[in-house]
Swiss-Prot record:
Family matches, as InterPro entries: BRCT_dom, BRCT_dom_sf, DisA/LigA_HHH, DNA_ligase, DNA_ligase_AS, DNA_ligase_CS, DNAligase_adenylation, DNAligase_N
EC class of the enzyme, as a word: ligase
Ligase as UniProt keyword: yes
Name assigned to this protein: DNA ligase
Cofactors: Mg(2+); Mn(2+)
Gene: ligA
Length: 758
């Protein structure tokens, strides 16, 4: 239990403070006693399921809230603290499924902080305590902070005697764990015999067993293929794999391990955490390449921010950053509470996985007719945003995930990635859940649904011309930033144009009409909108005009400012380059990359229409699938009518070629990473494509150049590993102007010029 509690956080929880202590409190009421007892019971239940059954009954974020509430009550009413309180224990209870073994020294948990402000307070407090308790040590050598990734895996304790692995155990309750030696021996990275000489007589080595992100995806695919429910996350998969009764089954799972500390030791003298890491690596144990020894708070903050941005580029899942005082003398001086060390803390990133209720599964009809199921959930906050819907892709995915309507589900939202329903929490089913059944008819137009061709997983509505939902989606798409870039034509405007509540005849019944609109066409359009009462949605819908103001006796109805903006932007959109027009047409498989390639190769819509399928397929970045989709699209009369109508309304259907731009990058694949001074990302991509090159989003052995600006990320690391030529911005400009030969020559000259003459 944390020693002191003070300032109230915005979320109502109490954070630690060095100077504040709990205020005297009245005798706890019966309701508070009942809440305390339930918290103790629930947390112990959730812990047992998490540590011993590889089952997450609540999300990590929910567990943290419950645990902090328990700590808050105990701080205000210490007389309530019971011996079986989770705050008095380190981890989960020991399962009866494996032989219990006692650790030589206790394995502690870590204190968690959830904000930068809390972390700063902890560091200030730890620094002050270190100066007070280990003043001479700190004066001689200022504190350094070993900062490392908090792997989201299963804690394991390895015991070596004279370099020989004699036992491996789970953390358990921190004092007693479960003997899993035979299963751990199946992990290839773990040596049975340590390397080197003068090995300690006995040493405990702590680490984390995990499944790498890419291996987890493959494992779940394999499991689903056998008809079983997939694992909810890599941590559960690792825990379940280590608890297999037969080591041969564990050996089939892609387990890995990284070690991060030393427990008890006999015959080993080491001065710091970082020194011990170097020793562990020399012994042949797998250590993390990501740890750093830092000297100040700002460096720690930079480390946290860096991996907060790049956490999904890593080998494994992380849920935070661990910060430790590096030297052991200071650690020993600070010591431990009953549960956590006073010299280490875990900063937890905002949760990316939460639990919520799956209320229903509905379907959406997309712009190319694809019918996609999506989950409707109780709104929940995850990764900084509130989510209440998530795609389920197709009926096979729904089946593979094993989700039922009414399930409590694990919802994941990683960074900018779209929210994903990972799977159900099976232990919380009560028998009232029901299966999702894919509709056989389009919910928008009633047309029979079917795969586009035999063997397709996706089912589609073939009524592209007349399906109202498909038209709405296409109109919304053509206004997007990657197409005509019409900001005033958003989702609600697309509904108003194609599916208004009034009038019965929509202003836009085919996207051919979009550039032929006049303001008067929109005067009577009304949509249904949820009414607000004092700024709060009421659940009551009303009919409101969308494109015109309501109007009064004094002031007649007139176009809104957004409607005026819409017509200005429609006029501006007519001058967009050819590739954007191609994107706006919603041709299946034809995205920005293929559209740019087609526009560069042919120069005009007429030339693209006249090209044969082999001619289209020969274009770099197009290929046979896209070529076939183009031929199929242009074969429809009503598709060609859209192009003709847009052309008649002034939309540009040919690019003015700048013959002065040489095709210096023909056949080259280039990746841009980081920030450039003279180019934003789109401008750099445009410059590459205009010169005949391919602008790729990821580095591979087929990449010719990587252009690295400021804050270049993992793409730069990968380029260096693969031996791909890396250019700075000046080198990129040389490459654009003169091509690869001149760029290589410039590099060689620069290299020669940097040598010194004796």
């Amino acid at each position: 239990m944390p020693e002191n509690f003070g300032a109230m956080r915005q979320d109502g929880l109490v954070s630690t403070s060095e100077s504040d202590s709990p205020a005297p409190a009245a005798t706890p009421a019966a309701t508070l006693r009942a809440e305390y007892s339930k918290l103790v019971e629930d947390i112990r239940h959730y812990r047992f399921a998490y540590y011993n059954e590889a089952e997450s009954l609540v999300s990590d974020a929910e567990f943290d809230v419950l645990f902090r509430r328990l700590e808050e009550i105990e701080a205000l009413h210490p007389e309530l603290i019971s011996n079986d309180s989770p705050t008095q224990e380190v981890g989960g209870e020991v399962s009866a499924a494996f032989t219990p073994v006692q650790h030589t020294s206790q394995i502690y948990s870590l204190e968690d902080v959830f904000s930068i402000e809390e972390l700063q307070s902890w560091i200030i407090k730890a620094q002050a305590n270190a100066e007070k308790l280990a003043g001479s040590i700190v004066a001689e050598r200022p504190l350094r902070w070993l900062t490392e990734l908090k792997i989201d895996g299963l804690a394991v304790n390895l015991l070596y005697r004279n370099g020989q692995l004699v036992r491996a155990a789970t953390r358990g309750d921190g004092i007693t764990g479960e003997d899993i030696t035979h299963n751990v021996l199946t992990i290839q990275e773990i040596p049975r015999q340590l390397r080197g000489e003068n090995l300690p007589e006995e040493v405990e080595i702590r680490g984390e067993v995990f499944i790498a992100s890419k291996d987890f995806l493959a494992l779940n695919e394999q499991i689903v293929g056998t008809g079983r429910a997939p694992f909810a996350n890599p941590r559960n998969a690792a825990a379940g794999s280590l608890r297999q009764k037969d080591p041969a089954d564990t050996a089939k799972r892609p387990l890995s391990m990284l070690v991060h500390g030393i427990g008890s030791r006999i015959g080993l003298d080491v001065a710091s955490q970082s020194e011990s890491y170097a020793l562990l690596k020399a012994w042949g144990l797998p250590t993390s390449p990501y740890f750093k020894v830092l000297t100040g708070y700002q460096e720690v903050l930079d480390y946290i921010n860096h991996y907060g941005e790049h956490r999904h580029d890593l080998l494994h899942e992380i849920d935070g950053i661990v910060i430790k005082i590096d030297d052991f003398a200071s650690q020993n001086a600070l010591g431990f509470t009953s549960r956590v060390p006073r010299w280490a803390v875990a900063y937890k990133y905002p949760p990316e996985e939460v639990h919520t209720k799956l209320l229903d599964i509905l379907v959406n009809v997309g712009r190319t007719g694809r019918v996609t199921p999506f989950g409707v959930m109780e709104p929940v906050k995850v990764a900084g945003s509130t989510v209440e819907m998530a795609t389920l892709h197709n009926q096979d995915v729904v089946k593979a995930k094993g989700v039922l309507i009414g399930d409590t589900v694990v919802l994941r939202k990683a960074g900018d990635v779209i929210p994903e329903i990972v799977g159900p929490v099976l232990a919380l089913r009560d028998g009232r859940e029901r299966e999702f059944v894919m509709p056989t008819e389009c919910p928008s137009c009633g047309t029979a649904l079917a795969p586009a061709k035999e063997g397709d997983v996706d089912i589609r509505c073939p009524n592209a011309k007349s399906c109202p939902d498909q038209l709405r989606e296409r109109v919304f798409h053509l206004a997007g930033r990657g197409a005509f870039d019409i900001e005033a034509l958003g989702w609600e405007a697309a509904i108003a144009l194609t599916q208004p509540a009034e009038p019965e005849l929509a202003p836009v019944r085919n996207e051919a009409q979009i550039f032929n609109l006049v303001a008067e066409d929109l005067a009577l359009v009304k949509i249904k909108r949820e009414k607000k009462v004092k700024g709060v949605l009421s659940g009551v819908h009303e009919l409101v005009p969308y494109f015109y103001s309501k109007g009064t006796e004094e002031k007649p109805s007139e176009p809104t400012s957004n409607t005026v903006k819409l017509f200005i932007e429609l006029e501006k959109a007519k001058a967009q380059p050819l590739w954007r027009v191609l994107v706006a047409l919603s041709i299946r498989h034809v995205g920005p990359t293929a559209s740019r390639a087609l526009a560069t190769a042919f120069g005009s819509m007429a030339a693209i229409r006249a090209a044969s399928e082999p001619e289209l397929a020969e274009v770099d970045g197009v290929g046979p699938t896209i070529a076939a989709a183009l031929i199929e699209w242009f074969a429809e009369d009503w598709h060609r009518e859209i192009i003709d109508a847009w052309a008649a309304d002034g939309v540009r259907m040919a690019d003015e070629r700048d013959e002065s731009v040489r095709r210096t990058l023909a056949g080259l694949t280039i990746v841009v990473t980081g920030s450039l001074e003279k180019f934003n990302r789109d401008q750099a991509k445009e410059a590459i494509i205009n010169r005949g090159g391919k602008s790729a989003g990821s580095v591979s052995k087929n990449t010719d150049y990587v252009v690295a600006g400021e804050n270049a990320g993992t793409k730069l690391d990968k380029a260096e590993k693969l031996g791909v030529t890396v250019l700075d911005e000046a080198g990129f400009e040389t490459l654009l102007a003169h091509g690869p030969d001149h760029s290589a020559e410039a590099e060689e000259n620069e290299s020669e010029g940097s040598t010194t003459n004796d």
